[in-house]
């Protein structure tokens, strides 16, 4: 019986694919070597310790229907589309070695006629006429008895869109999270015009088989053909939840300010695990009472635009004479935080 396992996802849902990855990683025998091949529709994928409000242009993402997905490994934020092929290698310890999986990917590229090399921050690079360009980035995760290496190969990604979503709006965030390093990148189709997702998957699969001298039958998985993984539905629900993707952000502070016809306002927030734990308001409004009430009411509220706007609107009952001001404030809050 082969010690290898090969899974190929037909789903483009990042939450589905990351849930598959997590379940396999937790449940695989430590004697097994796993290769999982997948790709995502338009998504910003952030590292386990990152702050999405700092890393991402969340307003633009929502307008364009771009998903946010938090992975369980460290590292920086990346933009995925169907021009990226994603790979995950998993193995038990002591056999797990990220240099082995890196070599398998390099062997796959070499078989396609492209010489690449490993570089610094977990990247694979190639020499081009315009200099060194990154074609692959990776992240890693280890537990006591196993580890995984996952990454992407840029095949035909829309590189112009990287900056659209990875460069945040200018917000006064003082964050304890990690800011991504932007890298100079290139698509493999610029160097290998005939390469596509299927071609690269076949090359990586063959390099995987060749390295270990074994083969196995691929398992094709999709939302209509769920993987046989205990607890998958629960993991899928968690992976797609706001609590995981946003609520796991590192603690941070945020300042919002604006001037309305009725006065200026500054709102200071301290946020932990996606929830406002402290809110302060400063204003030169002639009637600060509803704003002071808002600061109190926001404590314990999820740091979500719709929640904060609803909290503001709920105060209209207590302050009917300030209905217009509170409505204007609610609309501003919802717009500013997207």
Swiss-Prot record:
Transmembrane segments: none annotated. ATP binds at residues 71, 76-79, 134. One of its GO terms (biological process) is protein modification process. It is an enzyme of class 6 (ligase). Catalyzes both the ATP-dependent activation of exogenously supplied lipoate to lipoyl-AMP and the transfer of the activated lipoyl onto the lipoyl domains of lipoate-dependent enzymes. Belongs to the LplA family. This is Lipoate-protein ligase A. It comes from Pectobacterium carotovorum subsp. carotovorum (strain PC1).
């Amino acid at each position: 019986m082969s010690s290898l396992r090969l899974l190929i996802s037909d789903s483009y849902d990042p939450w589905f694919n990351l849930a598959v990855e997590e379940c396999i990683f937790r449940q695989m025998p430590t004697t097994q070597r796993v290769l999982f091949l997948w790709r995502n529709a338009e998504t910003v994928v952030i590292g386990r310790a990152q702050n999405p409000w700092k890393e991402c242009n969340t307003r633009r993402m929502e307008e364009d229907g771009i998903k946010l997905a938090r992975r369980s490994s460290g590292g920086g934020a990346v933009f995925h589309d169907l021009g990226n092929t994603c790979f995950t290698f998993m193995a038990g310890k002591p056999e797990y070695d990220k240099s082995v999986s890196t070599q398998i990917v390099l062997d796959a590229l070499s078989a396609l006629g492209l010489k690449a090399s490993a570089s610094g921050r977990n990247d694979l690079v190639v020499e081009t006429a315009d200099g060194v360009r990154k074609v692959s980035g990776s992240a890693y995760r280890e537990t006591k008895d196993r580890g995984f290496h996952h990454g992407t190969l840029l095949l035909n990604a829309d590189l112009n869109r990287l900056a659209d979503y990875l460069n945040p709006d200018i917000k006064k965030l003082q964050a304890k999270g990690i800011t991504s390093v932007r890298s100079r990148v290139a698509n493999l189709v610029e160097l290998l015009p005939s390469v596509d997702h299927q071609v690269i998957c076949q090359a990586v699969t063959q390099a995987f088989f060749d390295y270990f001298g074994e083969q196995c039958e691929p398992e094709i998985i999709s939302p209509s053909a769920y993987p046989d993984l205990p607890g998958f539905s629960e993991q899928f629900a968690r992976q797609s939840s706001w609590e995981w993707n946003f609520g796991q952000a590192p603690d941070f502070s945020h300042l919002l300010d604006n001037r309305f016809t009725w006065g200026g306002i500054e709102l200071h927030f301290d946020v932990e695990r996606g929830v406002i734990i402290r809110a302060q308001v400063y204003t030169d409004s002639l009637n600060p009472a509803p704003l002071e009430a808002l600061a109190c009411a926001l404590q314990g509220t999820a740091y979500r635009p719709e929640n904060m706007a609803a909290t503001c609107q709920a105060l209209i009952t207590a302050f009917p004479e300030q209905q217009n001001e509170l409505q204007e404030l609610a609309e501003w809050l919802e717009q500013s935080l997207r």
